[in-house]
A protein has these predicted regions:
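Short edge beta-strands and adjacent turn/loop segments
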Residues: 107, 146-150
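Short amphipathic beta-strand starts and helix->beta connectors
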Residues: 139-146
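Tryptophan-centered motif/residue detector
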Residues: 124, 140, 204-208
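Surface-exposed, low-hydrophobicity interaction/linker segments
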Residues: 91-139
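Alpha-helical oligomerization segments
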Residues: 148, 154-209
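A generic structural signal for short, non-catalytic loop/turn and secondary-structure boundary residues
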Residues: 95-100, 141, 151, 197-201
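Extended, low-hydrophobicity segments enriched in charged/polar residues
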Residues: 1-112
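Exposed alpha-helical structural elements
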Residues: 33, 111-114, 132, 168-171, ...
Length: 209
């Protein structure tokens, strides 16, 4: 897992989830408490990732209805205008053209979705909590071979061995929009244009506001 080494907000998020008593002074986290949290997450049954995504997508549809948006025409749109994405983005500094300081972390897990028990960065705004992150990551790994590979405090990127099929691209794009409604991977912001990215790409990018 690639992690931004100087991202204090990421450290704050990790401590907030694993040792909430020390979230105000996250450099003083209690190792025993963090270890117990990790064990708890790893020992719990993993939720049904497909069901989690269906619930989140249902929330997005309700939000669209509340905003008087037509789901098919204004949210889904046409599958067009996408560009391939085969490069991680979150650790690049646009001002310098170089990467931020990085940690290449070897996480001692048997399964890739268990990474979030060690790095519980979510559970704020629309970013899912650890059980949901683990469930969705398990489902996407089993379906597509997707592995969590790069992280900052508000970004997450998965790497795939090969792009998904064009036939499944819209289905997966809807799942990703449910998972991350702040997706900003394309010019018009429609799920269709995201789908046109996915069938050409081996990197999935997520960003939460």
């Amino acid at each position: 897992m690639l992690i931004q080494a100087d991202d204090e907000t990421l450290l704050e998020c990790l401590v907030m989830n694993a040792d909430p008593e020390h979230d105000a002074d996250f450099y003083e986290f209690d190792l025993k408490t963090v270890t117990e949290y990790r064990k708890k997450m790893l020992s719990a049954p993993v939720k049904d990732g497909k069901a989690v995504l269906e619930e989140l997508t249902g929330q997005r549809k309700e939000e669209a209805e509340d905003d008087d948006l037509d789901w098919e025409e204004e949210v889904l749109g046409e599958m067009e205008g996408g560009e391939p994405n085969d490069r991680f983005a979150n650790y690049w500094n646009d001002d310098t053209g170089m990467t931020y300081p990085l940690i290449l972390a070897k996480i001692p897990v048997k399964n890739p979705w268990e990474i979030f028990a060690y790095l519980p960065f979510g559970n704020w705004n629309e970013c899912p909590d650890t059980p949901d992150l683990m469930a969705v990551a398990k489902y996407w790994f089993e379906q597509h071979g997707a592995i969590p590979a790069a992280m900052s405090h508000d970004e997450l990127e998965f790497e795939l061995p090969t792009p998904i099929s064009k036939e499944r691209a819209m289905e997966v794009a809807v799942e990703q929009y449910g998972f991350c409604p702040d997706l900003d991977q394309n010019e018009d912001g429609s799920i269709g244009s995201l789908a046109d990215v996915l069938w050409q790409s081996t990197v999935w990018y997520f960003w939460w506001d």
